[in-house]
């Protein structure tokens, strides 16, 4: 897919990730949102390639093809953070985040309510991740951005509308 129509935004996100990687910053998170089919997942991969990182996607299904439970996906994310922290030039992509955290339309609110984890615990996970992560949602979160940790909010319809 051609993203030339958002070249400035693509360059901005790429520079942000390059600096974060070079300086080994922790807590680097980007939230992309937009309607289904707008190319959010492809854009995340393009950004990864442009920055020179390998993009690792958190699975949505088991090896048997069954949907993973929300907690299993978040556990996979935490494991990937630990494993990839030792691998330079890695980027995590967590797609379809609203399927995992459907209530409240926030990627973190329903997980917080259903798992018993507090907002503070979730924020700590985001603020301390060693590997930059791109979180992808088909809808805008319904929560003030400052209350879900260190996330660069980036929409895709059009970007920086």
At which residue positions do the language-model features occur?
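Walker A/P-loop nucleotide-binding motif
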Residues: 23-43
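Walker B catalytic acidic pair
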Residues: 95-97
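Pre-Walker A (pre-P-loop) alpha-helix and adjacent loop at the N terminus of AAA/AAA+ ATPase modules
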Residues: 2-30
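Short glycine-rich substrate-engagement loop in P-loop NTPases that contacts/grips substrate
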Residues: 55-87
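Short regulatory helix/loop adjacent to the ATP-binding pocket of P-loop NTPases
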Residues: 125, 137-151
């Amino acid at each position: 897919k051609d993203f030339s129509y958002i070249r400035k935004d693509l360059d901005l996100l790429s520079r942000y990730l390059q600096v974060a990687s070079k300086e080994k910053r922790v807590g680097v998170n980007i939230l992309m949102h937009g309607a289904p089919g707008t190319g959010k997942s492809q854009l995340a991969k393009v950004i990864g390639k442009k920055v020179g990182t390998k993009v690792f996607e958190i699975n949505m299904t088991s090896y048997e093809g069954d949907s993973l439970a929300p907690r299993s996906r978040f556990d996979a994310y935490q494991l990937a953070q630990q494993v990839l922290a030792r691998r330079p030039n890695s980027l995590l992509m967590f797609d379809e985040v609203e399927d995992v955290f459907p209530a409240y339309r926030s990627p973190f609110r329903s997980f917080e309510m259903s798992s018993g984890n507090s907002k503070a615990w979730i924020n700590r996970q985001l603020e301390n991740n060693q590997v930059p992560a791109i979180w992808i949602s088909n809808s805008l979160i319904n929560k003030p951005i400052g209350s879900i940790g260190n996330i660069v909010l980036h929409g895709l319809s059009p970007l920086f509308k």
